[in-house]
Amino acid sequence: HHAHDKMRYYRLSESRIKRIIRYPSRTEEGIIENGIACMQPTCGKIYSEIWVMYILSGLVIERKIKIITCWRYPGKSQNRDPIPSEILKEIHMLV
């Protein structure tokens, strides 16, 4: 419910969230355990970034992406911890 409330608050559609997960401009470690945060910049007069935080849940064979939250960051955020390449390969196989 939290992610749906945030999507409504920031006027983000499900397809936009899926697009951010499939084609992120930047991917970092999330603040929760095993969390992944990915970002895409928005186009417009004022620069902002849309972030999605999710975790990979389930068994190795039946992996699923569970969206924790999404938000719009006003401005440019600093680069933080990148995701290891093995996890990125696993995510690309799911999507």
Identify what each model region corresponds to:
Residues H1-V95:
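Ribonuclease/tRNase effector modules and their secretory precursors
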